[in-house]
Swiss-Prot record:
<dbReference type="Pfam" id="PF06855">
    <property type="entry name" value="YozE_SAM_like"/>
</dbReference>
<dbReference type="InterPro" id="IPR036806">
    <property type="entry name" value="YozE_SAM-like_sf"/>
</dbReference>
<dbReference type="InterPro" id="IPR010673">
    <property type="entry name" value="UPF0346"/>
</dbReference>
<dbReference type="InterPro" id="IPR023089">
    <property type="entry name" value="YozE_SAM-like"/>
</dbReference>
<protein>
    <recommendedName>
        <fullName>UPF0346 protein SAG1509</fullName>
    </recommendedName>
</protein>
<comment type="similarity">
    <text>Belongs to the UPF0346 family.</text>
</comment>
Length: 71
């Protein structure tokens, strides 16, 4: 069973990095309502589009999701 996107994303945290995956990881870490148990693209994508308290480039998110699927 695949670990949740959030769990994988937390392995990418690096506050000193300017890489989009590290930036998203830091944002998600601070976001109490992030869908932490989801491994569903639509759930996470809709959250980022409609509910997140931060703004993030969704093209970068698509690339990050591909990395998640390929890990």
């Amino acid at each position: 069973m695949r670990k949740s996107f959030y769990s994988w994303l937390m392995t990418q945290r690096n506050p000193k990095s300017n890489e989009p995956v590290a930036i998203l990881a830091d944002y998600a870490f601070d976001e109490t309502t992030f869908p932490k148990h989801s491994s569903d693209f639509e759930t996470v994508s809709r959250y980022l589009e409609d509910e997140a308290s931060f703004s993030f480039n969704l093209t970068d998110f698509d690339d990050i999701w591909e990395d998640y699927l390929n890990h």
